[in-house]
Amino acid sequence: MPHTVATPPPLLQVRGISKQFSGVVVLKSIDFTLQPGQVHALLGGNGAGKSTLMKIIAGILPPDTGVIEMNGQPCFNLTPAKAHQLGIYLVPQEPMLFANLSVQENILFRLPKHQADKKKMAQLLKNLGCHLDLSVSAGSLEVADQQLVEIMRGLMRDSRILILDEPTASLTPAETHRLFSQIRMLLQQGVGVVFISHKLPEIRQLADWVSVMRDGGIALSGATADFSTEDMIQAMTPEAQKGALTDSQKLWLELPGNRRAQSRAQSQQPVIHVHDLSGEGFAHISFHVQAGEILGLAGVVGAGRTELAETLYGLRPASTGNVILEEVNITAMKTANRLAAGLVYLPEDRQASGLYLDAPLSWNVCALAHDRQGLWTQPAQEAAVLERYRRALNIKFSHLEQPVRTLSGGNQQKLLIAKCLEANPLLLIIDEPTRGVDVSARSDIYQLIRSIAEQQVAIIFISSDLEEVVQMADRVLVMHQGEINGALSGAAMNVDTIMHMAFGEHRSVSEPQGGTASSAENKGASC
């Protein structure tokens, strides 16, 4: 008889996993397999069940039914500690570092002595091209650097199964390239990677196998090469997405007591004029934004975009220069006064600085009004406000008192936008609005931002996704090392030009530009 070679079992096999919360089914008998040396991409809309499934595999949540096997052996009563011992590590979408500990302490936290090798850590950092100061507190890092620290924690643990939840959402193209190189090195060692992403080109570049989740089940699964991009999108969003908000949504979205309608609707004066502003992380910034205009702010991580936004909002002090909002100098104003004047900021990290995760949805959506009016709340009014934004933004939730942390990432982002809109902005600063958001929710957010601009709100749009910047902005300012390297509009706005300018090149474009923000504006580049 011919000798038959036994096929080795999968690295990870999940069979019949189901889960429900408060009677709501979120996972429906899921089967999922990961082979050694394989990247298995996981796609799905916000709320499809991706994060819940991964939390079950990582031991954070128990399944209601089903079996998890690793190398053919069943894993019962998984906990995070037991999962780590088995070589399963989840790198979360939102970094969960200890803010007061150093970068090095975070990377080595609770590592067994035989794994806490500083030479190995230094080599991994070199492989990733990281130049982090290991002695600084993790809380002082930008989100992209915090994400790299989370990835380092997984790599240091010699993980056999590495679950990456939107790992490139805040990374530059160069950082993404280095991360992918490191992943390929791990694959050669037999490590299996679950790669959760909404960036379809990255999935095609990296993943051997893809599964698409929808409504708590697997809607599509197979070799990545067997499916077109349209196949994947249709599996995620079976109902065709409309190209714009419906008339009904626009009606619900109309800003209450729109400041622009109340004041100089026909004024040609800019909503905001920034003149020679300097502060921590940036210098000599000058630009202005008109009512109804979307001004893109592009640049690599560390260029000073978030620092500039936080200074405009009053979270950081300016060292020199002036900020004029509607002809009023707000440079010395506190944040609360700027908010009352109509300057509203949607921060990059929605969980750390944007939303109160354990507070009810209805309270969160009116939180900026609470800041202005005190802590006395009006539950009926809050419920009506939340219902209005639910209809306008298609926010999905079960009940008004539901804690924010129970929402999917895309619905959290929509709630944060609703919170900012309820403050009735003249100027809305939006920092990375689609980070970690799926294809359909991203489209919703784009249409939402355009509809806000149509109501004559001025918008500063900050994003690391250059295609997104080109798609959304009327003009783009490109920052490099804390200064504006140039301004682009019209046909001159393209990803290639922005990328080169973000890395410090002065390119020949149709719009005049200068080496500093002041010179760019004086030449008409930002007028």
UniProtKB/Swiss-Prot annotation:
UniProt xrefs under Pfam families: ABC_tran
Keyword annotations from UniProtKB, A to Z: ATP-binding, Cell inner membrane, Cell membrane, Membrane, Nucleotide-binding, Repeat, Translocase, Transport
Reactions performed catalytically: ATP + H2O + (2R,4S)-2-methyl-2,3,3,4-tetrahydroxytetrahydrofuran-[AI-2-binding protein]Side 1 = ADP + phosphate + (2R,4S)-2-methyl-2,3,3,4-tetrahydroxytetrahydrofuranSide 2 + [AI-2-binding protein]Side 1
Entry binding sites for ATP: 44-51
Keyword Repeat: yes
Gene Ontology molecular function: ATP binding; ATP hydrolysis activity
Domain (ABC transporter): residue spans on this chain: 12-240, 266-506
PROSITE patterns per UniProt: ABC_TRANSPORTER_1, ABC_TRANSPORTER_2
Entries under Gene3D superfamilies matching the protein: P-loop containing nucleotide triphosphate hydrolases
Region entry Disordered, spans: 508-527
Ranges annotated as biased composition (Polar residues): 510-521
Top-level class of the enzyme under EC nomenclature: translocase
Record bears the keyword Nucleotide-binding: yes
CDD domains: ABC_Carb_Monos_I, ABC_Carb_Monos_II
Enzyme Commission code(s) on record: 7.6.2.13
Annotated GO CC locations: plasma membrane
Membrane topology per record: Peripheral membrane protein
Localization, UniProt: Cell inner membrane
Subunit structure: The complex is composed of two ATP-binding proteins (LsrA), two transmembrane proteins (LsrC and LsrD) and a solute-binding protein (LsrB).
Family label: Belongs to the ABC transporter superfamily. AI-2 autoinducer porter (TC 3.A.1.2.8) family.
Name under which the protein is recorded: Autoinducer 2 import ATP-binding protein LsrA
